[in-house]
């Protein structure tokens, strides 16, 4: 059986045999279908690129029907249990699990680059009195590139690597700066002897001049959440990273663009929306009425459903377990029972089952963050810190891909036909 698709253009009666590779046909082959030589050629219309593969990638694999997520072939369940964020970041970048020597060298490099340039603090001082941390983080990533003018040499592998290390290493400090700026507090430098996640907690929570020692369970929980959020195929922010990067922009500009995409409430703000929903529902006895209102179209069950996953999000199962470990330390979030009852009903109710609405990674993560003392406006920042690793792995893959061209989609024009300008006096 040939791996081809035969199309007949009923406008002309001509048939075309299009090759199928990796369950896809090339848009360029569709473009060859035309009525006459002067015709532009056939286009595909795909708003939001729902069924369009814009690249080939070796980084993340998702099977939405089976609820599978893998980084570089490794199941997310194994990485969350056995690995660490910094090891996963290196895996995403290099494609293989590192040796102990390789991991130690990587950690040393991250350590050496973890403090942003001193003058970057002045940027935060120039912002509004209480800027949203995501807005401040976007500005910081964009400004960071001005301190490293070599960054525009994106075709130099050594230069690329230095910028990748700097961005991943400095993301926690920039995020902590943004949070402390909103609270009107001075910045706290990183401390020695703490993990990547632990140092972020120190820079965020410490009193100036004093060391903050994170609880090991909470430190590990945050690291696991960083692993779960490190990459997720071609989502909105990753596509923004690739799209801006395709113009040969430096990685700082591309990361700023990706962070801006993540700032959108339809992308990075989902766990915040879940928490607000749970606060709105309130007590356990109000769950049935809320479910009824959702089924009537009067509200939305936040944290359920996903563009890709049509079964249980594998990350959600891990987050649920992490939540139990965190609550054993912090005490149970009073909204946990409400969340569990919403999940129980939704997994049994035909309305949600038939629509394949299952819990996603955001359903329980907001409860964890709240229990750990993070303000709601930091939730998306906690998404952005680890996602820098995925963004940069995707960016470098794009830079090295010989098929890469500057992103330039087509449109279907629906505006006015040609018309003559009318002078103001004649309108």
Residue ranges and their predicted role:
Residues 1-427:
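Non-transmembrane, aqueous-exposed alpha-helical and coiled segments at domain scale
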